[in-house]
Design a protein with these regions (language model features):
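Active-site anion-handling motifs in enzyme catalytic cores
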Residues: 25
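Sparse, context-dependent recognition of short Cys/His-centered cofactor- or disulfide-binding micro-motifs
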Residues: 4-6, 11, 29, 86, ...
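Active-site-proximal beta-alpha core segment in soluble small-molecule metabolic enzymes
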Residues: 43-194
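N-terminal glycine-rich anion-binding loops that anchor highly charged ligand groups
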Residues: 2-6, 28-32, 38, 43-51
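Generic N-terminal amphipathic, Lys/Arg-enriched alpha-helix
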Residues: 1-21
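A short alpha-helix capping/helix-coil boundary motif
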Residues: 10-14, 34-37, 52-56
Length: 194
């Protein structure tokens, strides 16, 4: 262990900007998430859009079920660096991209029943679990720019457009409306979904 002067010189040599990760705190939080998953039966997934430091994926993979991806590059990163469950959602898919996603993903969420009708059969044939995103039309956000339930949003199927006749083959419903919010907002959203 060097002196403060030596440490400072080393620190000043670090290129900026740089991100520091306290691995002990990261692992402490991961243990909490693993406990939540065990206690509830929920699968806890890493949202790569928020944290894609793949150097830590082996550590994260010891505690979480897998990742969420918003496209082919994040899905590939998940497959290559963590190798656990790989879930993907995008508002729109291109056919060639969906084919590549189906080869590496475990679960694909469609944004509309039109997407499900267009791509569902080929996705299921690849052995991929499929879901559909719903829009609970219940805003819990303070800022419309971050609110997927804001008026005019095209994220997810609204109740007026919901098709019970097209549920066969879907494994679940997906909603994503909570960003840095607590249980109160989740309770309101769940009530709207029910």
């Amino acid at each position: 262990m060097g002196t403060f002067v030596q440490w400072r010189a080393e620190w000043n040599a670090v290129p900026t900007p740089s991100y520091l990760v306290y691995e002990e705190l990261l692992e402490k939080n991961l243990r909490i998430l693993a406990e939540v998953a065990e206690d509830t039966g929920a699968k806890v997934l890493l949202a790569q859009k928020c944290f894609s430091m793949y150097h830590y994926y082996p550590l994260i993979g010891r505690y979480l079920a897998g990742t969420t991806a918003s496209g082919i590059y994040e899905a590939r990163l998940s497959q290559e660096e963590m190798g656990k469950e790989n879930h993907v959602f995008k508002p729109a898919y291109e056919e060639d991209e969906l084919h590549r996603l189906a080869a590496i993903c475990d679960h694909i969420i469609f944004n509309s029943f039109a997407q499900w009708e267009r791509f569902g059969a080929q996705t299921r044939a690849a052995g991929v679990s499929c879901g559909i995103r719903i829009n609970p039309e219940c805003s819990t956000q303070e800022h419309a720019i971050y609110d997927p339930c804001a008026p005019g949003s095209r994220l997810g199927v609204k109740i007026a457009d919901f098709r019970e006749d097209l549920l066969d083959g879907l494994d679940g419903l997906h909603f994503h409306t909570l960003c840095e919010q607590g249980a109160d907002a989740l309770a309101l959203t769940l009530e709207a979904v029910e």
